[in-house]
């Protein structure tokens, strides 16, 4: 089965979801971040927990690291963190505190030499987050246009020892309308790197379709708070 990585998005140590990455669409989730981690601990099919520091992503500096350390202590499952990671010191701090993988976005996209250096220092432990409105890459908490096409960016990082590529179609994110299967499949075909799909995933049928097109893992946000999503999963 496709790997399942449920997401916990944080603003001020509160678990929230946004729609299309718009900060004014913030909705507090019924389960707290702590409750979510404990809930996901029950499922063998969850092989990683995906944490995003939303204000960190917007403000270009890690904000939630102390709270994320508390969440880390609640689970033995691998944990990855993204949002506001712009320097080696932040990566070192997360890794030293038991975080297994870090997600690089804006800094890596704007400074490929730095990204190359970091991936050499931490091979297969860094993931590049490519967040796009359809094919146009967005940066700084999805609020600015990077002036790049996702496939051009993918080609530029193909030789780097990344753990994989996390692709989010912003136009789908938080809507529970299904992921962008077409572009996701094109990305799978365009790279040797694992592609992780994010944004819009609704149910197990979406997971099955993503698996059928070669997606390595699925990051599930809003749907993971629906009881029906978990029916039949162990």
From Swiss-Prot:
Enzyme Commission numbers on file: 5.3.1.16
Major localization class: cytoplasm
Keyword set includes Methyltransferase: no
Compartmental location: Cytoplasm
Residues of the active site: 9 (proton acceptor), 131 (proton donor)
Metabolic or biological pathway, per its Swiss-Prot or TrEMBL entry: Amino-acid biosynthesis; L-histidine biosynthesis; L-histidine from 5-phospho-alpha-D-ribose 1-diphosphate: step 4/9
Molecular functions per Gene Ontology: 1-(5-phosphoribosyl)-5-[(5-phosphoribosylamino)methylideneamino]imidazole-4-carboxamide isomerase activity
EC class: isomerase
Cross-referenced SUPFAM superfamilies: Ribulose-phoshate binding barrel
Any one of the GO BP annotations: L-tryptophan biosynthetic process
Keyword annotations of the record: Amino-acid biosynthesis, Cytoplasm, Histidine biosynthesis, Isomerase
GO cellular component: cytoplasm
Catalytic reaction equation(s): 1-(5-phospho-beta-D-ribosyl)-5-[(5-phospho-beta-D-ribosylamino)methylideneamino]imidazole-4-carboxamide = 5-[(5-phospho-1-deoxy-D-ribulos-1-ylimino)methylamino]-1-(5-phospho-beta-D-ribosyl)imidazole-4-carboxamide
InterPro entries the UniProt entry points to: Aldolase_TIM, His_biosynth, HisA_bact_arch, Isoase_HisA-like, Isoase_HisA-like_bact, RibuloseP-bd_barrel
Superkingdom, natural source: Bacteria
Cited CDD domains: HisA
Protein family: Belongs to the HisA/HisF family.
Listed NCBIfam families: 1-(5-phosphoribosyl)-5-[(5-phosphoribosylamino)methylideneamino]imidazole-4-carboxamide isomerase (TIGR00007), PRK13587.1 (NF010114)
Name assigned to this protein: 1-(5-phosphoribosyl)-5-[(5-phosphoribosylamino)methylideneamino] imidazole-4-carboxamide isomerase
Gene source species: Staphylococcus saprophyticus subsp. saprophyticus (strain ATCC 15305 / DSM 20229 / NCIMB 8711 / NCTC 7292 / S-41)
């Amino acid at each position: 089965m496709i790997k399942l990585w449920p997401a916990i998005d944080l603003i001020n140590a509160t678990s929230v979801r946004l729609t299309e990455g718009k900060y004014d669409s913030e909705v507090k989730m019924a389960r707290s971040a702590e409750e979510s981690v404990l809930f996901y601990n029950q499922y063998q099919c969850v092989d990683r927990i995906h944490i995003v520091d939303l204000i960190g992503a917007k403000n270009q500096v890690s904000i939630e690291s102390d709270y994320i350390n508390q969440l880390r202590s609640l689970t033995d499952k691998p944990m990855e963190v993204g949002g506001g990671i712009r320097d080696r010191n932040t990566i070192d701090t997360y890794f030293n505190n038991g975080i297994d993988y870090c997600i690089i976005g804006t800094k890596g996209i704007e400074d490929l030499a730095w990204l190359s250096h970091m991936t050499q220092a931490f091979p297969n432990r860094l993931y590049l987050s490519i967040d796009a409105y359809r094919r146009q890459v967005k940066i700084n908490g999805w609020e600015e246009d990077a002036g790049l096409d996702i496939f051009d960016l993918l080609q530029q990082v193909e030789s780097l020892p990344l753990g994989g590529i996390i692709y989010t179609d912003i136009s789908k994110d938080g809507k529970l309308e299904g992921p962008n299967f077409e572009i996701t499949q094109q990305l799978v075909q365009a790279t040797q790197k694992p592609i992780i799909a994010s944004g819009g995933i609704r149910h197990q049928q979406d997971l099955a379709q993503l698996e059928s097109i070669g997606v390595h893992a699925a990051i599930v946000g809003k749907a993971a708070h629906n009881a029906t999503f978990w029916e039949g999963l162990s």
